[in-house]
Every structure is written in C-alpha cells, then in structure tokens.
Amino acid sequence: EYINFLRDKKDMRNSTIGKQMGFLKWFLRWSFKKDYHQNIAYDTFKPKLKTTPKKVIFLTWDELNKLKDYQIPKDKQYLERVRDVFLFCCFTSLRYSDVRNLKRSDVKSDHIEVTTVKTADSLSIELNKYSKAILEKYKDIHFENHMALPVISNQKMNDYLKALGELAEI
C-alpha cells in the first residue's frame, strides 16, 4: 500500500520509491534495536521495483581530442572557457560541482587536493599534461573568491557545451 501511495499519490518513480523504502527500513531497524517494537517482517520485504538502466553517455578519446583541438570561431570565443572547464573535468574525473569549488590554494605543482561536494571525500588527484596546461592558461587571471578556473553556471555551461558539440560536429 505504501509503495502504491508513493507511486500514485506522490508521483514518485521507482528509484525514488526504493530510496524511501531504504529510509523506512533503516528507521524500523533502529526502532527495533531500541525495543520500540518486535516486528521484523520488514527485514525480509523486498519489493520488486522495475528500474530502467541508465544509459551512460560519454565521449571517446577521439571525440575528446576533436573537442580539444577544435578551432572556436572568432565570434564565439566565450566557448573557449567552457571547453577548458569541461576538458578539465574530463581529464581529472571531477564533477562540475567540484571544479566549480576548486580554489587556487587546492592546486599544487603536480596534483590538486579537493573535498568533493557530493560525497565529501578528500581526494588528491594527479594532474596530467592536459589538466596542467589548462590550469597554467588561467594562472594569472583573477577569478572571484580565488577560484582556479572560469566556471559559469551549470545550466549555461550545458547550453554552451551543446552548442560547442554541434559546432565541432561531435
């Protein structure tokens, strides 16, 4: 009944329903350990929720190089910064949110030290020649709050990346 309620009344998808069920099971386990109830039926309850596998979209190495080497038209130079930030994300495996928060003080000579936004993991990431070149390009340019790179809003960046992909025929 609870699953039907979440699906029909709250308009939740199966992945969200699965998370809600996980929260409920956690609470029921906690309350059982505290002797608030003696029912353990929840422990064996495994709803069959259909999920569609996520389609992973990625660039091949050739496509990444094509983007890196693409000559941006003179009237669209604003796309250069977007490309650089995107390529930095690719070459370091950092999420947009982590590059958005990357400060100059996080940049060391051969690596960067970051605490990720999503998982709060502390990481030390070795810089390859591509990521070093991007940081070097912007090292003398001042950005607000001592940021290392010229990161714009995620929505704008996605819009510009789409345009850049079309221009570069990727």
Ranges and model annotations:
Residues 29-40, 89-109:
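Short, charged phosphate-coordinating catalytic segments
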Residues 19, 26, 101-102, 159:
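DNA-binding alpha-helical recognition surfaces that contact promoter or target DNA
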Residues 46-47, 92, 101-137:
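Conserved tyrosine-mediated DNA breakage-rejoining catalytic core shared by Y-recombinases
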Residues 1-29:
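Short, Lys/Arg-enriched alpha-helical recognition elements, typified by the DNA-recognition helix
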